[in-house]
Regions:
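Active-site core of glycosidic bond-cleaving carbohydrate-active enzymes
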Residues: 2, 6, 10, 18, ...
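Beta-rich accessory regions
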Residues: 7-15, 19-22, 26, 31-34, ...
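A residue-level signal for beta-strand positions that form part of recognition/binding surfaces
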Residues: 58, 175, 200
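A glycine-rich beta-turn/hairpin centered on an aromatic-Pro dipeptide
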Residues: 163, 173-184
Length: 233
């Protein structure tokens, strides 16, 4: 709904934009009212009313930048209830793992500012799944799916860096924001020659600062880790 509002504004439809923002606020409140819950002492979300077990899809509010219960949700996602050496369980009630929810969860953890926890999970996942003995693709539900490949989910891995670590979020056809959450284990992170928003730009993060430059090297924006910069191309 918020992205619909941005699109409507770009198209000059302020009435629809306002309606979408109002509906988004109502939905935000409903998510907290219906799904907000304390499970195992952690302030997070329940999958539905009456369910008192953790499920990995509690990560979705973080991916949608709803951080009301970010700390409790981060604790739940990285707890022994859900996280295993070989991946993330879909539910604490069974031993089925699915990389799709794992990749969403890591992206959400970065976006919520829990970058060091997220990076530990990301590094273990990358070494085990993508650089291990198997073909480098995310896998479907295991053991019930027999580790069938989910090749399309490779895009979710990329989104961890773009939307999670760098926090790139569209604000218009030629505008976007950058909110870097770089883990302490990385001394720098650079993405060069990004083609998006009608232009070409690069992002370099090091020494606690993130610098956005255009194709010619001119500085477009600078921000500290955890802060937000608005970029117009």
């Amino acid at each position: 709904l918020l992205y619909c509002a941005i699109l409507a504004e770009e198209l000059g439809d302020s009435e629809t934009a306002a309606l979408c923002r109002t509906e988004a606020a109502v939905l935000h409140q409903a998510i907290e009212r219906v799904f907000g819950a304390s499970i195992h002492g952690m302030e997070t979300y329940r999958y539905h009313e009456g369910l008192d077990e953790l499920r990995s899809w509690i990560c979705m509010p973080l991916c949608m930048r709803i951080f009301d219960r970010a700390d409790g949700t981060a604790a739940a996602l990285t707890s022994s209830y859900l996280l295993r050496a070989d991946g993330m369980l879909t539910s604490e009630a069974n031993e089925t793992m699915w990389d799709r929810s794992m990749l969403y969860a890591v992206r959400g953890l970065f976006a919520a500012g829990h970058m060091d926890e997220a990076f530990r999970v990301l590094r273990a996942y990358s070494e085990n799944r993508l650089l291990g003995e198997r073909v480098p693709y995310p896998v479907e539900a295991y053991p019930e799916g027999g580790k069938r490949h989910l090749s399309g989910e490779s895009a979710l891995y990329c989104k961890i860096f773009v939307e999670g670590m760098l926090g790139i979020e569209p604000l218009g056809f030629r505008r976007f924001s950058v909110t870097p959450h770089i883990p302490s284990a990385l001394d720098h992170l650079t993405l060069s020659h990004i083609h998006a928003h009608g232009g070409v730009f690069s992002i370099d993060c090091r020494g606690g600062k993130c610098t956005v430059t255009d194709a010619g090297g001119a500085v477009l924006a600078v921000c500290s880790y955890g802060e937000t910069a608005i970029v117009t191309l």
